[in-house]
Amino acid sequence: MKEKIVLAYSGGLDTSVAVQWLIDKGYDVVACCLDVGEGKDLDIVYKKALDMGAVECHIIDATKEFSDEYVSYAIKGNLMYENAYPLVSALSRPLIAKKLVEIAEKTNSVGIAHGCTGKGNDQVRFEVAIKALNPSLKAFAPVREWAWSREEEIDYAIKHNIPVSINHDSPYSIDQNLWGRANECGILEDPYAAPPEDAFDLTNALEETPDTADEIILTFDKGIPVQIDGKTYELDDLILTLNALAGKHGIGRIDHVENRLVGIKSREIYEAPAAEVILKAHKALETITLTKDVAHFKPIIEKQFAEQLYNGLWFSPLTDSLKLFIDSTQQYVSGDVRIKLFKGNAIVNGRKSPYTLYDEKLATYTKEDAFNQDAAVGFIDIYGLPTQVNAMLHGGYSNEQ
């Protein structure tokens, strides 16, 4: 009886070729495809996996779990790797790994295979997650093992009659989910080459965007967006709605050269319309609901959290602790944020909260001012005392300094 291998199957080039490759190695292939909001026709994927020779194919709708358990932390934590990348692909990997392990245990498979290359981040993310969840499972990386170029892989697919929606003229590698879309390879590998319009799918070019702005009110409850203009949504539906609306205005295009975990720099094209709008709105709401010390310290945690996720360490004690901290900061991050969507920009022009720490009577310069300006003299004396003592001992700073 042949041993079984669970394959993370997308229906794309790498995993379609991997099915045949694993069969040639003597394994029965159990294909597993997760829907995390990419809008893929899963019936086609299911049929294709079986046509490729898989003995089973499991289709799992994990969109809601993805939004509620993973994207929610990206929002509450304002997660951006290198202040540019909203972790589109990285965010889905721990969930995919979790489901693959569940299928492997259910089918008595000896290991899990993925379609990642040997120079990408995802191989690390999947394999480290698998080790954390079930150390007894083996990891298989066909693409890494055969070490073909993109062109060689396409030629192999054509030779073996493997249908793939890719050719030498359009050799993009695309990954998409609820939170956005990632694109690499082809002309995009030249960091000076302007991305052609066919590299984008979720967003309009600025020249094609409406000449009239849309203004929306995004309502948050404990850090999570729950309404658009007073209409309540589940988080996954809200994100899909915003993707369409913000994408229409060309919002969410990201052209980024990032530092990969494996040590190389990689040029990536991302589209994340909803992510850009939600994160800007969330940050705006935090400016009036977080205390100064929390507002200043939280970005340090956010940076570490983003790096943990990018580096494949979702299932780790540190990440568990970071999640607890992030959750603790969101108790009062509730309220409304008004955002103008226009010509590639998401512009926050208003925010309010029942828990606002902004006191207009303290901030105003009108006669309604409630701030005790007389208290400033004593405050400055105490605050400036260390500076004064240092100057008295060592001499004051000269104009030249």
Curated annotation (Swiss-Prot):
> One Pfam family, short name please?
Arginosuc_syn_C
The record's annotation in InterPro entries points to: Arginosuc_syn_C (IPR048268), Arginosuc_syn_N (IPR048267), Arginosuc_synth (IPR001518), Arginosuc_synth_CS (IPR018223), Arginosuc_synth_type_1_subfam (IPR023434), AS_cat/multimer_dom_body (IPR024074), Rossmann-like_a/b/a_fold (IPR014729)
Query: Residues that bind L-aspartate, according to the entry?
Result: T117, N121, D122
Listed EC numbers: 6.3.4.5
- Where is this chain's protein located in or outside the cell? Cytoplasm
Q: What SUPFAM superfamilies is this protein classified in?
A: Adenine nucleotide alpha hydrolases-like, Argininosuccinate synthetase, C-terminal domain
Please name the GO terms of the biological process aspect recorded for this protein, alphabetically: argininosuccinate metabolic process; L-arginine biosynthetic process; urea cycle
Known HAMAP family for this protein?
Arg_succ_synth_type1
Could you say which protein family the record assigns here?
A: Belongs to the argininosuccinate synthase family. Type 1 subfamily.
Assembly behavior: Homotetramer.
* Record protein name field: Argininosuccinate synthase
Question: What is this organism's lineage?
Answer: Bacteria, Bacillati, Bacillota, Bacilli, Bacillales
